[in-house]
Amino acid sequence: MHGLIPDKLPRHLAIIMDGNGRWAQERMLTRIIGHQKGVETVRIIVEECSRLGIGYLTLFAFSAENWLRPKTEVKALMALLKKYIASEAARMDANNIRFNVIGNRDELPPDVNKAVQGAIDRTSGNTGMILTLALSYGARQEIMTAATRIASDIASGVLKADDLSETAFASYLFTSGLPDPDFLIRTSGEMRISNFLLWQLAYTEFYFSSVNWPEFTPEELYRALSDYQARERRFGRTSAQINTRS
């Protein structure tokens, strides 16, 4: 038993899945084997989050900066991504999971984009957890894209500068329609957010696990969620104010 309190689970959980290469290196295996093992962990954690009743799960799968990795590794990652999405679409559909992608999809290979769109279309009517993969994603690029679109809309009269608010700005981001993450987990012991959801993480609780992603089990997930449930989220208020409101 995990001992978690259902009513205190994060509505939106985000995970930076780090440590595939490190896990492989420790075992004298190739990096791609580490990524393959990481995909198995994705499958397990996605289904566990859905079972727990978490409404939104966002996974940082491939950053805008990851294109700078060796071409052989990038090619292998794209092939693995295509295979995962194509093979998991039916499983997601059966589990009532809705699939979503954020990032610059135009930079993805056509066959990967085809698999992505197929999974999005197949699961579009589902009402359970929304699984979002961040692919070719960078938060600074996201913010710049939003700012450019806003400037264009103001110039064309679609938007008035005086009407620009935080809510209006957020509607121009890739994550439009998604709530901000309540909880962010990063694996492998690294303590940084690596250009991930810079706007959206303003009041998110962070948790850094020393476990590499391929070894991130449901038990490790429960440990992280238990830590989250023990925290007091204040959103700039005092403890007294929070207790009075509750």
UniProtKB/Swiss-Prot annotation:
Record keyword Magnesium present: yes
Gene3D superfamilies referenced in this protein's UniProt entry, alphabetically: Decaprenyl diphosphate synthase-like
Cofactor mode of binding and number, as noted: Binds 2 magnesium ions per subunit.
InterPro entries named among the record's database cross-references: UPP_synth-like, UPP_synth-like_CS, UPP_synth-like_sf
Root EC class: transferase
Annotated keywords: Magnesium, Metal-binding, Transferase
CDD domains: Cis_IPPS (cd00475)
GO molecular function, a single term: ditrans,polycis-undecaprenyl-diphosphate synthase [(2E,6E)-farnesyl-diphosphate specific] activity
GO cellular component terms listed in the entry, alphabetical order: cytosol
Residues of the active site: D18, N66 (proton acceptor)
Biological process (GO), any one: polyprenol biosynthetic process
EC numbers, comma separated: 2.5.1.-
Cofactors required: Mg(2+)
Residues the entry annotates as binding substrate: 19-23, 31, 35, 63-65, 67, 69, 186, 192-194
Residues that bind Mg(2+): D18, E205
PANTHER family per UniProt: DEHYDRODOLICHYL DIPHOSPHATE SYNTHASE 2, DEHYDRODOLICHYL DIPHOSPHATE SYNTHASE FAMILY MEMBER
UniProt family annotation: Belongs to the UPP synthase family.
Entry function: Catalyzes the condensation of isopentenyl diphosphate (IPP) with allylic pyrophosphates generating different type of terpenoids.
Subunit field text: Homodimer.
Name the UniProt record assigns to this protein: Isoprenyl transferase
Protein source organism: Geobacter sulfurreducens (strain ATCC 51573 / DSM 12127 / PCA)
